[in-house]
Amino acid sequence: MTKPTPNEIGKGYDAFADLLDQLWGENLHHGYWDDESATLEEATTRLTDRLAGMLPLRAGDRLLDIGCGNGEPAIRMATANDVMVTGISISEKQVERANDRAYKADVDDRVVFEYADAMELPYPDASFDVVWALESLHHMPDRWHVIRQAARVLRPGGRLALGDFLLVPSPAGLEADAERVREVGKGVVAVVSLDEYQAHLREAGLEPESAEDVSQYTRPSWTKAAERFEGLREQALQHIEAAQFEVTLGRFRAFSEEPSLGYVLLTARKPD
């Protein structure tokens, strides 16, 4: 299945912005459940905090958020760590909403959101202390190219922080696992093993640092999303055909039962 172009992805997010907000809440990414009673909104915030906690953020650091969504993670980090954040998205509606959110949070003096394509970052070399990509790289036509772009705009000593889907090996072997995930996801989610991921980081000139497999804590996201999506059937059918609704709902449920579809939090450092 051919991956959608960045322009198609951006238009898709524009078209379904309201529905996505109802589905995921403030954060358009998975949640982290170390407490089974946590709501989806609480769990997604915990995942943001979990990845941010893997970084030595300092006041005044410049951070680039690739795939900023509605801007909540960027605003949260700016508020908690006094960093300067530039967030980018290929969804004009997300950029508009994120800037409005930053204004209302009174952080628009240090948080700005721009329309930009991560495949061709419009920033000079060595211009950021941190590049952050929380669950956005799987949308990219070539995630390894984006990582090379991230390495380019990082300053020496800067760090890349990622949250991404991971291929968790089973006795069937990686090739069989990858094929099964591809079949379930129909090209929506492409995954590789941790070893392959870290090899690509090294090829981009980055030194892998921390890697935390959080699959068991993020897996409930699929079940929660399926439950909430089912409850949004009436609203969803205003945007998509009934057949597509059932395909999407079925995919959420299939992902929740697929043991080889995992989730990893990674950091890597650009050498001095």
From Swiss-Prot:
Keyword annotations for this protein, in alphabetical order, are: Antibiotic biosynthesis, Methyltransferase, S-adenosyl-L-methionine, Transferase
Q: Which reaction does it catalyse?
A: 27-O-demethylrifamycin SV + S-adenosyl-L-methionine = rifamycin SV + S-adenosyl-L-homocysteine + H(+)
The family database entries (SUPFAM superfamilies) matched by this protein are listed as:
S-adenosyl-L-methionine-dependent methyltransferases (SSF53335)
Enzyme nomenclature, EC number: 2.1.1.315
* Sequence positions that bind S-adenosyl-L-methionine: 89, 94, 117-118, 134, 139
**What are this entry's molecular-function GO terms?**
S-adenosylmethionine-dependent methyltransferase activity
Q: Which InterPro entries match?
A: Erg6_SMT_methyltransf, MeTfrase_dom, Methyltransf_11, SAM-dependent_MTases_sf
GO biological process terms held by the UniProt record = antibiotic biosynthetic process; methylation
Its pathway is: Antibiotic biosynthesis; rifamycin B biosynthesis
Q: How is its activity regulated?
A: Slightly inhibited by Ca(2+) and Mg(2+). Strongly inhibited by Zn(2+), Ni(2+) and Co(2+).
- Noted pH dependence of activity: Optimum pH is 7.5-8.0.
Q: Does the keyword Flavoprotein belong to this entry?
A: no
Does the record's keyword annotation contain Methyltransferase? yes
Superkingdom of the source species: Bacteria
Knockout consequence?
A: Mutant loses its ability to produce rifamycin B, but accumulates 27-O-demethylrifamycin SV (DMRSV) as the major new metabolite, together with a small quantity of 27-O-demethyl-25-O-desacetylrifamycin SV (DMDARSV).
> Which PANTHER family does the UniProt entry name for this protein?
GERANYL DIPHOSPHATE 2-C-METHYLTRANSFERASE, ZGC:194242
What's this chain's function? Catalyzes the methylation of 27-O-demethylrifamycin SV (DMRSV) to rifamycin SV.
Family affiliation? Belongs to the class I-like SAM-binding methyltransferase superfamily.
Query: Subunit structure of this entry?
Result: Exists probably as a trimer.
Name this polypeptide is given: 27-O-demethylrifamycin SV methyltransferase
What is the originating organism of this protein?
Amycolatopsis mediterranei (strain S699)
